[in-house]
């Protein structure tokens, strides 16, 4: 069994737990209130891959568009999940997609529900950008980090969305982070 290492990143959307096998990132998750690292994981803040991720997050949260392309990722999942996660990575900064559009991207237009399940099980939040997925009418849908975090990320990237019937296009939280 491969050893897993972890560190944290204090992002503006909450503390992120980052896991690595020592070479690649395997998970990035929003730390939950009752969340405790697995005792088999090793705390290691200085891994080169963790340093790359920290720098990429600093750039991302400061509004830089291309930050994550040099981060080695190794998410574990089925072939279907892997296809969806790869399709998510092809959605550029500032763009949005829907579950239906993702199903079309993988040439399986009837798999919308399965696509939703794969998006929901994304193990590498933000870098595999599941926050860029909205309902077919641009409405907010669920997000592992919570809707407030999703709003922040969408506003950071200036992605317009509809929240409770109101269109939001202004990056109001972006300014807050920089003050």
UniProtKB/Swiss-Prot annotation:
It is found in: Cytoplasm. GO terms for molecular function: methylated-DNA-[protein]-cysteine S-methyltransferase activity. CDD domains: ATase. Keywords: Cytoplasm, DNA damage, DNA repair, Methyltransferase, Transferase. Its EC number is 2.1.1.63. Transmembrane segments: none annotated. It holds the Pfam family DNA_binding_1. Signal peptide: none annotated. It is an enzyme of class 2 (transferase). It catalyses: a 6-O-methyl-2'-deoxyguanosine in DNA + L-cysteinyl-[protein] = S-methyl-L-cysteinyl-[protein] + a 2'-deoxyguanosine in DNA; a 4-O-methyl-thymidine in DNA + L-cysteinyl-[protein] = a thymidine in DNA + S-methyl-L-cysteinyl-[protein]. InterPro entries: MethylDNA_cys_MeTrfase_AS, MethylDNA_cys_MeTrfase_DNA-bd, MethylDNA_cys_MeTrfase_DNAb, MethylG_MeTrfase_N, MGMT, MGMT_N_sf, WH-like_DNA-bd_sf. Its main location: cytoplasm. GO terms for biological process: DNA alkylation repair; methylation. GO terms for cellular component: cytoplasm. The active site is at residue 130. Belongs to the MGMT family. Involved in the cellular defense against the biological effects of O6-methylguanine (O6-MeG) and O4-methylthymine (O4-MeT) in DNA. Repairs the methylated nucleobase in DNA by stoichiometrically transferring the methyl group to a cysteine residue in the enzyme. This is a suicide reaction: the enzyme is irreversibly inactivated. This enzyme catalyzes only one turnover and therefore is not strictly catalytic. According to one definition, an enzyme is a biocatalyst that acts repeatedly and over many reaction cycles. This is Methylated-DNA--protein-cysteine methyltransferase. The gene is ogt.
């Amino acid at each position: 069994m491969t050893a897993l290492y972890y560190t944290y990143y204090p992002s503006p959307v909450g503390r992120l737990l980052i896991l690595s096998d020592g070479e690649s990132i395997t998970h990035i998750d929003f730390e939950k209130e009752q969340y405790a690292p697995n005792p088999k994981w090793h705390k290691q803040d200085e891994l080169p891959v963790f340093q790359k991720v920290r720098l990429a997050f600093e750039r991302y949260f400061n509004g830089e568009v291309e930050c994550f392309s040099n981060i080695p990722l190794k998410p574990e999942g089925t072939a279907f999940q892997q296809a969806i996660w790869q399709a998510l990575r092809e959605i550029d900064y500032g763009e949005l997609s829907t579950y239906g559009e993702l199903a079309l991207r993988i040439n399986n237009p009837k798999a919308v529900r399965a696509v939703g399940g794969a998006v929901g099980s994304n193990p590498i939040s933000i870098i595999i950008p599941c926050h860029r997925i909205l309902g077919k009418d641009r409405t907010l849908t669920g997000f592992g980090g919570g809707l407030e975090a999703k709003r922040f990320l969408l506003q950071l990237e200036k992605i317009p969305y509809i929240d409770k019937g109101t269109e939001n296009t202004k990056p109001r939280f972006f300014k807050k982070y920089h003050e």
